[in-house]
Amino acid sequence: MKYKVNWIKTKEGNGIKAGNTLIVKITDARIVSGWIAKKTFYGRKMKQVGQSKNTLSFKLKERKGKRTIPYKKGNYLLKVSAFDKKNKNQQWSDEFEVI
């Protein structure tokens, strides 16, 4: 299985613009699940959870009252787990920056 995400390169490493969609593609996967969390001084705050067959997508937006606003700038954590046809598990963890 191979893991591919639509990152843009920044000075700090992986990044993506606020409000865009983060797409995670994994080849030869039967089930894919993952989550995004914001890194904080006390640990992490869960933002989104997703599950799909071979492609996960996260819209980097959140609801504030009746409005939809993009995520705030900062460091976030992406954790992905995938199972293949033989039920073997593989996990990836990635830190990225919202700019």
Model-derived regions: residue spans:
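Interdomain boundary/hinge segments at the C-termini of tandem beta-sandwich modules
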Residues: 96-99
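Beta-strand-rich extracellular modules
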Residues: 81-85
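Short, compositionally biased P/S/T/A/G/V-rich stretches that sit at domain boundaries
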Residues: 1-23
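Signal that preferentially marks extracellular ectodomain short beta-strand elements
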Residues: 57-71
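Short proline/glycine-enriched turn/loop motifs at strand-loop junctions of beta-rich domains
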Residues: 26-33
